[in-house]
C-alpha cells in the first residue's frame, strides 16, 4: 500500500468522525467527534503534502479541545474566539500558497464561531458556508478524504437540521 493510499484511508476515517459529529444533538459530543476528526485530518493532510491543511487542522483540534472544556474557568471567555481567529490568520499568512489559502483559512474562522456556540441548531446553521470553502482546497490538493468529508458534512448538517431543527 502506498503512502498516498494510506493517507486517503486516514482521510476516510476522519470523514466518519466528522459526519458523526453533526448527527449528535449535544455540544460536547459534537466537539468530541471534531477532536477525533481534526487529529486524523492533521495526519492526512501532512501525509499528502498539504502542510497548510495539516497545520490548520492541528489548530482546529486544539480549538475543539478548548471549546470542549468551555465549562472550566481557563477555557471560558470570548477571548478564545479572537485567539483562534488570529492563529488561523497568522497560519494563513505564514503558509501562504496564494489566494487558495483564503478558502480554508476563512472556513476555520467561521467554524471557530460555529463551535463556540453551544446550541447545536446554530452550530449546524453556521457550518453551511464553511464546508464549500474547504472543498475547493481539497480538490486542488487531491484530498479525496477531505473532499468527501465536506460533501458528507454538508449532507449531514442538512439531515441534522431536518431531524432536530425544523418545526413540527
PLM features: what roles do these ranges have?
Residues 1-168:
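Alpha-helical membrane-protein topology signature
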Amino acid at each position: 500500500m502506498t503512502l498516498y493510499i494510506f493517507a486517503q484511508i486516514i482521510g476516510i476515517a476522519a470523514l466518519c468522525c466528522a459526519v458523526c459529529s453533526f448527527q449528535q444533538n449535544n455540544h460536547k459530543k459534537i466537539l468530541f467527534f471534531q477532536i477525533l476528526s481534526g487529529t486524523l485530518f492533521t495526519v492526512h493532510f501532512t501525509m499528502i503534502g498539504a502542510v497548510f491543511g495539516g497545520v490548520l487542522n492541528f489548530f482546529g483540534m486544539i480549538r475543539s479541545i478548548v471549546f470542549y472544556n468551555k465549562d472550566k474557568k481557563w477555557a471560558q471567555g470570548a477571548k478564545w474566539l479572537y485567539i483562534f481567529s488570529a492563529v488561523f490568520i497568522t497560519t494563513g499568512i505564514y503558509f501562504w500558497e496564494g489566494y487558495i489559502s483564503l478558502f480554508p483559512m476563512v472556513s476555520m474562522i467561521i467554524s471557530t464561531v460555529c463551535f463556540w456556540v453551544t446550541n447545536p441548531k446554530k452550530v449546524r446553521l453556521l457550518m453551511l458556508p464553511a464546508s464549500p470553502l474547504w472543498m475547493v482546497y481539497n480538490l486542488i490538493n487531491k484530498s479525496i478524504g477531505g473532499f468527501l468529508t465536506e460533501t458528507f458534512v454538508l449532507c449531514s448538517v442538512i439531515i441534522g437540521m431536518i431531524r432536530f431543527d425544523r418545526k413540527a
